[in-house]
Amino acid sequence: MKERSTELVQGFRHSVPYINAHRGKTFVIMLGGEAIEHANFSSIVNDIGLLHSLGIKLVVVYGARPQIDANLTTHHYEPHYHKNTRITDSTTLELVKQAAGMLQLDITARLSMSLNNTPLQGAHINVVSGNFIIAQPLGVDDGVDYCHSGRIRRIDEEAVHRQLNSGAIVLLGPVAVSVTGESFNLTSEEVATQLAIKLKAEKMIGFCSSQGVTNEEGSIISELFPDDAQRRIDTLEQAGDYHSGTVRFLRGAVKACRSGVRRSHLISYQDDGALLQELFSRDGIGTQIVMESAEQVRRATINDIGGILELIRPLEEQGILVRRSREQLEMEIDKFTVVVRDNLTIACAALYPFPEESIGEMACVAVHPDYRSSSRGDMLLMRIAAQARQQGLQKLFVLTTHSIHWFQERGFLPAEVEMLPKKKQALYNYQRRSKILVLDL
């Protein structure tokens, strides 16, 4: 008899909403030269092919910094920089074109065979490159001529869209031509960022050597707003880091987010499957740079009833929460606050005020099992306490049988039944023997 894998079933169920959400959307993927050199690059290419097979429109932008540096070293040619930007003279330009051209051929070949040895073997991936970008020179700064180092002048986004709509993957590198026919060396982060903005991409995705941006303790920061990301860039640059995959992608992500790209993702090129885990799981694996959090704390509406019921049912069955019917929830939905992440209700709580006695009850506190080790409970407590203060209440009480210490650690003190509002005293269940805890607001 074949073994049944419940883990596979659960994983597929969780990923299906993201498959549907991503289908038909445009993603810009930025691959630095470091990622291309890494042993895991073949897996990354295979995963890019898988994304394409799911109906996602893909623009892949590759960089070549380490390959260019290696070419310069081989030819005993010293690289030159001004204000941390490479000066591309004629000799350097030829070596840049050589490195970029080799990478383009290599990546095209790998993408063309990315679905081999998979159930999708035989499916054809059309990879298109072209003069979609027109460049212009950086010019002269402080008397220093950047020569063939350039910037983007314009992008033919309509031509790119035509290729994407025809089912092709668009592959672009760091070299573009000008209206005069000259070639210019661009930065991959500028190319990826401007493409994401002009194409109105849903996402921009970049790879670095770590799993994302980390805090002082070394833990991954799952979400950054542009201002926070800019502060991180400033810190890295002050430490002398101008060219790592992290700082280069963050620069682009900040600009992209402020220009309308909803989410930019930074993940590791060393971790097999990081791209799929980031895109097809609720919490991802790296760092997102977003204008608006994927997680919202808000007052519940009638549309949240199904999510709240799904969240509290297991706790009701365990006797942790008092059972509530759908009808009761519909009548009391205005009392509830929810934490929602990607349309999933992951936490809830309710405030029942007793204004005549200047006290309120915090009830039906529930947090999804996957998020109990984080701060969602504290988030709800802060929101409920703020609502209570706005209503002029002076105290907040809870009735609990299992979370006594959690509430006490947050300032709640034990109390007797006589401390409850009169209406609540009359309804107190002496068989359940819930502990009464009160917080002075």
UniProtKB/Swiss-Prot annotation:
* PANTHER family hit by this protein: AMINO-ACID ACETYLTRANSFERASE, AMINO-ACID ACETYLTRANSFERASE NAGS1, CHLOROPLASTIC-RELATED
- The gene behind this protein is argA
Q: Cross-referenced InterPro entries, in alphabetical order?
A: AceGlu_kinase-like_sf, Acyl_CoA_acyltransferase, Asp/Glu/Uridylate_kinase, GNAT_dom, NAGS_kin, NH2A_AcTrfase
Quote the NCBIfam families the UniProt record gives. Answer: N-Ac-Glu-synth (TIGR01890), PRK05279.1 (NF003641)
Q: Principal localization?
A: cytoplasm
Q: Which cysteines are joined by disulfide bonds?
A: none
Quaternary structure and interacting proteins, as annotated: Homohexamer.
Q: Which reaction does it catalyse?
A: L-glutamate + acetyl-CoA = N-acetyl-L-glutamate + CoA + H(+)
Q: Which HAMAP family match?
A: N_acetyl_glu_synth
Q: What is any one GO biological process for this UniProt entry?
A: L-arginine biosynthetic process
Q: What class of enzyme is it?
A: transferase
Question: What's this protein's name?
Answer: Amino-acid acetyltransferase
Which Gene Ontology cellular-component terms appear in the entry?
cytoplasm
UniProt similarity note: Belongs to the acetyltransferase family. ArgA subfamily.
Q: What is its EC number?
A: 2.3.1.1
Metabolic or biological pathway, per its Swiss-Prot or TrEMBL entry: Amino-acid biosynthesis; L-arginine biosynthesis; N(2)-acetyl-L-ornithine from L-glutamate: step 1/4
The Gene Ontology terms for molecular function here are: L-glutamate N-acetyltransferase activity
